Amino acid sequence: MDRNRASARLTVLLRHLGCRSAGTIIAHHTSGVGSLASFHPQQFQYTRENNVLSLEQRKFYEENGFLVIKNLVSDADIQRFRNEFERICRKEVKPLGLSVMRDVTITKSEYVPSEKVVSKVQDFQEDEELFRYCTLPEILKYVECFTGPNIMAMHTMLINKPPDSGKKTSRHPLHQDLHYFPFRPSNSIVCAWTAMEHIDRNNGCLVVLPGTHKGPLQPHDYPQWEGGVNIMFHGIQDYDKNNARVHLVMEKGDTVFFHPLLIHGSGRNKSQGFRKAISCHFADANCHYIDVEGTSQENIEKEVVDIVRKKYGFKDVTLKDVWTFRGRVVKGERINL
């Protein structure tokens, strides 16, 4: 896509969303159900017909690979998630399998139990309070539009993006989430990502490249950043820099659903506060595992397996084993994953 086409695409996209400034999407309400009677189901590759999404919403996701639903998660639920995260940071609870991550710039001498040294917790499937996010009816109602009725919660995170230290390590390189997942098909996987407070470019909002979900999985590796890179923050090594970029400005409770091939990332947190969001990747329980040997995903397989072996002392663990352990059925029945 050349620069002119990218610019035209972005203009149409922003006009559709009613944005006032180029390069920024302000999350807006997208309720309402449109008739699909005149639109043949075979024309939809990425969404399923269940009378939740309007025709306009389905077309938007099909074309762009993401959809923002405003004010989806309540303030009360978000406060509960925040409280539980703080308990984890203080080491008052230690859920099985949970990974607590710190920014690469924080030295061991700064490991004081508080949210100020924790940049992310992931794999909270054994934390009853945080995992409630993955079972919220308002979340699953939309997830089913992409996965169908048998839904697995596969990957969970609560992100606490810290104020940048000046080394720009709080940013997340552009990447595709499918790079981390050894299961397919990609069209039956979706991420739900909920803002836990106001999020904009100043505190490191998501940036997406609309339409890139239609392309293939790209090779990923660690970017060569002078200030260092956080563990597992792989990025795409070569992508079309002429692609339009859209920054998602979101309010507390707003939720974006996006395809695992959508290229996205986030900027550094230039504010003095911690930017929080909670997310889960869901998949159709009918998805199947693949062997990533000989593919661009070999590097992430080796890294994940090495971490699990060192953390738990397992000798013969595979990437499939890791994801089978993480996965939880949240609606319908468990089938393949």
From Swiss-Prot:
InterPro entries: PhyH, Phytyl_CoA_dOase-like. 2-oxoglutarate binds at residues 120, 157, 175-177, 193, 266, 275. The keyword Disulfide bond does not apply. Pathway: Lipid metabolism; fatty acid metabolism. The modification N6-succinyllysine is found at residues 59, 108, 252. Residues 1-30 form a transit peptide. One of its GO terms (biological process) is fatty acid alpha-oxidation. This is Phytanoyl-CoA dioxygenase, peroxisomal. It comes from Bos taurus. The lineage of its organism: Eukaryota, Metazoa, Chordata, Craniata, Vertebrata. The gene is PHYH.
